């Protein structure tokens, strides 16, 4: 595991939970002696849904809803087995989606 790199992508609808989770990951990796790059904020996806307010006619009256997906990227360079073990035991909130690539 000397020349490996772990790339972690985090996604969440709430940016505060996302930032707290990324700080937890960075602190855990740094405490085990690994070199960390990030968290890098990636572009936010914005999904907009337009619906009619009335059930039948009144097509001019519409309402728009949006949901934003915030993303962060963290690279852990040259992780030790201790780093991987600490990251596996890390407890993160339920609203955060995590993708890990080696």
Curated annotation (Swiss-Prot):
Keywords: Ribonucleoprotein, Ribosomal protein
Entry keyword Transport: no
Pfam families (alphabetical): Ribosomal_S10
Organism superkingdom: Bacteria
PROSITE patterns noted in UniProt: RIBOSOMAL_S10
Cellular component per GO, a single term: ribonucleoprotein complex
Entry's Gene Ontology BP terms: translation
Gene Ontology molecular-function annotations: structural constituent of ribosome; tRNA binding
SMART domains, per database record: Ribosomal_S10
Alphabetized NCBIfam families for the sequence: PRK00596.1, rpsJ_bact
Subunit structure: Part of the 30S ribosomal subunit.
Function of the molecule: Involved in the binding of tRNA to the ribosomes.
HAMAP family: Ribosomal_uS10
Assigned protein family: Belongs to the universal ribosomal protein uS10 family.
The protein's name in its UniProt record: Small ribosomal subunit protein uS10
Organism for this UniProt entry: Clostridium kluyveri (strain ATCC 8527 / DSM 555 / NBRC 12016 / NCIMB 10680 / K1)
């Amino acid at each position: 595991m000397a020349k490996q790199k772990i790339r972690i992508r985090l996604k969440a609808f709430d940016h505060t939970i996302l930032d707290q989770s990324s700080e937890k990951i960075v602190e855990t990796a740094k405490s085990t002696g690994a070199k960390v790059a990030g968290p890098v904020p990636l572009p936010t996806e914005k999904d907009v849904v337009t619906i009619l307010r009335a059930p039948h006619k009144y097509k001019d009256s519409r309402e728009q809803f949006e949901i934003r997906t915030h993303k962060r990227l963290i690279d852990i360079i040259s992780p030790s087995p201790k780093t991987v073990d600490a990251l596996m035991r890390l407890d993160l909130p339920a609203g955060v989606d995590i993708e890990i690539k080696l």
